[in-house]
């Protein structure tokens, strides 16, 4: 347990996470100061009166006078004000670091470019199925500090690369990097290796590292060591086994579950199930209850979610695909009897869209591209692409064209913030229009 008595603490960034940090310090007899670059950040109305606040910009004077800065994952450590504070020897941490210093129960930690929310939720469900008192959160659901509880027997945290950059005390009982594909390149000027380096911090002091046999970038810098357990499509300690037209989850050569018993579908979800099982095994959860959880889990909204099946057409909301790798995961091994009508677009965060090209061949694909980077996406295969300003226009354009056997898939490969509040709002809008048009 760290002691913050008498420390001058400054919190950057409000919202739910910022408020959880404020409450954390107030409970320990320390009154922090809060700043946010937004004029009226979310949660401002919930900030206790006693807490000094500065909004609309950063307050360099407060920062340079601080003993400890708690930075929101939304602000880059490379920001000149934070750089100056770091150069002056001021400690900069995030909420996850505060959490790790206090947590008394083992932590399962999950990061990766795609699939992390599904895997985090699944491991949480496996723990619940075993009757374990579990706290699930971090980058999804509740901020980590709100999970702190003496009664808790296990924590399962989803961590972003931004959160890992400010964390040094994590000692996970099991940690994984699911995959590393381009994302947030606007925050990583030195490219993919800089982004990977942030993710690799999750393995420091971890007891078991669950690595992706199909993605070398998920391996520890010095290569696999005795802490590593692997998963993969065809290889790895945990892998998929295809026999007589059926697919099984297999662990070290032993078939443990036929995927037809799972509610989740799609190859990317079968590998998510493998990782969750590997993490649950490493955390000491009983295998039987973990497998039972796999047969009941229905998946998360906006993640390859079938929102309508009508007249032989499936409308699928994969709005959570906010980067190229996530859309690749949706398209990889996808089977459509008729034509795939694929909706792409939004803010691409300076990503390279070219990896998508290999999935867009053949006569049975139509692209509908919208939003800020619509033109760039339409250029992937111009002869089958149409460009509109908004997603709604795209859906009204494609609706009269769909035939039985077709699939309409929103898997945009982009963030939603150019036209929507968040990916959830984009997904809800898609679902609403699907029900109207389908």
Swiss-Prot record:
Pathway: Cell wall biogenesis; peptidoglycan biosynthesis. InterPro entries: Mur-like_cat_sf, Mur_ligase_C, Mur_ligase_C_dom_sf, Mur_ligase_cen, MurD. It catalyses: UDP-N-acetyl-alpha-D-muramoyl-L-alanine + D-glutamate + ATP = UDP-N-acetyl-alpha-D-muramoyl-L-alanyl-D-glutamate + ADP + phosphate + H(+). GO terms for molecular function: ATP binding; UDP-N-acetylmuramoylalanine-D-glutamate ligase activity. It is an enzyme of class 6 (ligase). The keyword ATP-binding applies. This is UDP-N-acetylmuramoylalanine--D-glutamate ligase. It comes from Shigella flexneri.
């Amino acid at each position: 347990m760290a002691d913050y008595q008498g420390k001058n603490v400054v919190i950057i960034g409000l919202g739910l996470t910022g408020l959880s940090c404020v409450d954390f310090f107030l409970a320990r007899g320390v009154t922090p100061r809060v700043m946010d670059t937004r004029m009226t950040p979310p949660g401002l109305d919930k900030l206790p009166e006693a807490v000094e606040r500065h909004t609309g910009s950063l307050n360099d004077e407060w920062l340079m006078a601080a003993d400890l800065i708690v930075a929101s994952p939304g602000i880059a450590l490379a920001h000149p004000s934070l750089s100056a504070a770091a150069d002056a020897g001021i400690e900069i941490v995030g909420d996850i670091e505060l959490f790790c210093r206090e947590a008394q129960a083992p932590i399962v930690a999950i990061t990766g470019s795609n699939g992390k929310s599904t895997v985090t939720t699944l491991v949480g469900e496996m723990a619940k199925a075993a009757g374990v008192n579990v706290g699930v959160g971090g980058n999804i659901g509740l901020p980590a500090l709100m999970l702190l509880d003496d009664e808790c027997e296990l924590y399962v945290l989803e961590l972003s690369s931004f959160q890992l950059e400010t964390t040094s005390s994590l000692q996970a009982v099991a940690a994984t990097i699911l995959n590393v594909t381009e994302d947030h390149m606007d925050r990583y000027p030195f490219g993919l290796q800089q982004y990977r380096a942030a993710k690799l911090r999750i393995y420091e002091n971890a007891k078991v590292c669950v690595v992706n046999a199909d993605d070398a970038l998920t391996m520890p810098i010095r290569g696999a060591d005795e802490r590593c357990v692997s998963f993969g499509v065809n290889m790895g300690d945990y892998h998929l086994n295809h026999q007589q037209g059926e697919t099984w989850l297999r662990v070290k050569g032993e078939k443990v579950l036929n995927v037809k018993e799972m509610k989740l579908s799609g190859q990317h979800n079968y590998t998510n199930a493998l990782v969750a099982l590997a993490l649950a095994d490493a955390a000491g959860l009983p295998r039987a209850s973990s497998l039972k959880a796999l047969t009941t889990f229905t998946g998360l909204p906006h993640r390859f979610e079938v929102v309508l099946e009508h007249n032989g057409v499936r409308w699928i909301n994969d709005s959570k695909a906010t980067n190229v790798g996530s859309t690749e995961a949706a398209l990889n091994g996808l089977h459509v009897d008729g034509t795939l009508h694929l909706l792409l677009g939004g803010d691409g965060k300076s990503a390279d869209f070219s990896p998508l090209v290999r999935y867009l061949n053949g006569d049975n694909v139509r692209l509908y591209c919208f939003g800020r980077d619509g033109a760039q996406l339409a250029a992937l295969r111009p002869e089958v692409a149409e460009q509109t300003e908004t997603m709604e226009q795209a859906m009204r354009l494609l609706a009269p064209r769909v035939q039985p056997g077709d699939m309409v898939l929103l898997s945009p490969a982009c963030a939603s913030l150019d036209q929507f509040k968040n990916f959830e709002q984009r997904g809800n809008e898609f679902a609403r229009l699907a029900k109207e048009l389908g």
